[in-house]
């Protein structure tokens, strides 16, 4: 297998990868081409995972860890190389399934999000969440507008009845969605556009025309209302949902999403250079906790039903 290909070079440029990342990834890809044993071992991992269909991803990522040690490459970087080498295979599978090429490029944009997160948190080009891509490569998770969506089920052991009287029960079909760290503001227009696009893709699963979007995220932490600015897009995003449950913990596990590499600092040393960081730093310094929530949106294709 040729590793540094025109497809992968164009892939990195299409998403405007940082120069340092392109330089690092190009070096490693060319090394795989030049060092046959190294390249063959990587090929075995990529092909073992992708054929006949993606499965047991962690098994192959464990192999990447061993390669990183054997060939003295950063684990996060080599994980990303593994993902890059999967992308042209995924591209062909989109074509085979008749999935629009635009959807492929929109969906694969997530790799840049994770790349930037890794640079900000680990100070190295790569990814520290390579396993996240199993859903993408199995053609189960797709980007439609600002968000990423996939088929899910309501998996709580209690029923939930919305304000409009819709009941969710264990095992009921829902559409889960995720919020990539693309930096695109969560405005009313952007959110509604994503819901409408996803509705068109999944409406065949909901014969009565009513779709249930489900999300679990730190963004749905209900106490945001106590300390985020009134006009915050996070609060607007939260207002789309009916909250099913929420929790908070002494150890704010999602702090890295806000503070990047500084998330492990004492609270009195957390940076305050953005409005979100400032609000969170002040909240945590006052002895409060961070948390997350799970919620549902009832959608009829045009509007949220409340």
What are these regions (language model features)?
Residues 1-186, 204-212, 226-306:
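Non-catalytic substrate-recognition and accessory regions of acyl/acetyltransferase enzymes
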Residues 186-202, 213:
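Conserved acetyl-CoA-binding loop-helix of GNAT-fold acetyltransferases
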Residues 220-224:
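Short catalytic/ligand-binding loop motif for oxyanion handling, primarily in non-cytosolic enzymes
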């Amino acid at each position: 297998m040729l590793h540094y290909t025109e497809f992968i070079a164009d892939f990195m440029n299409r998403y405007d990868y940082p120069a340092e990342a392109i330089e690092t990834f190009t070096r490693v890809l060319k090394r795989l081409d030049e060092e046959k044993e190294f390249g063959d071992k990587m090929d075995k991992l990529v092909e073992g995972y992708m054929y006949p269909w993606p499965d047991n991803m962690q098994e192959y990522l464990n192999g990447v860890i061993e390669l990183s040690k054997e060939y003295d490459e950063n684990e996060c970087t080599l994980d990303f190389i593994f993902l890059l080498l999967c992308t042209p295979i995924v591209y062909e599978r989109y074509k085979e399934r008749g999935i629009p090429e635009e959807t492929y490029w929109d969906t694969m944009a997530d790799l840049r999000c994770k790349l930037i997160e890794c640079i900000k948190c680990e100070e190295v080009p790569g990814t520290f969440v390579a396993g996240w891509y199993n859903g993408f490569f199995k053609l189960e998770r797709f980007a439609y507008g600002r968000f990423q969506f996939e088929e899910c089920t309501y998996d709580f052991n209690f029923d939930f009845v919305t304000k409009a009287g819709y009941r969710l029960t264990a095992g009921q079909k829902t559409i889960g969605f995720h919020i990539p760290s693309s930096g695109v503001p969560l405005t009313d227009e952007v959110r509604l556009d994503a819901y409408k696009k996803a509705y068109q893709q999944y409406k065949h699963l909901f014969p009565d025309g009513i779709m249930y979007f489900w999300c679990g995220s730190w963004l749905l932490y209900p106490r945001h209302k106590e300390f985020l600015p009134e006009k915050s897009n996070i609060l607007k995003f939260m207002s789309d949902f009916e909250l099913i449950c929420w929790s908070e913990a002494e150890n704010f596990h999602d702090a890295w999403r806000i503070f990047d590499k500084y998330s492990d600092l004492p609270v009195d040393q957390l940076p305050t250079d953005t409005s979100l960081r400032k609000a969170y730093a002040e909240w945590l310094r006052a002895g409060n906790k961070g948390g997350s929530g799970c919620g549902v949106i009832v959608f009829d294709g045009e509007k949220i039903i409340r």
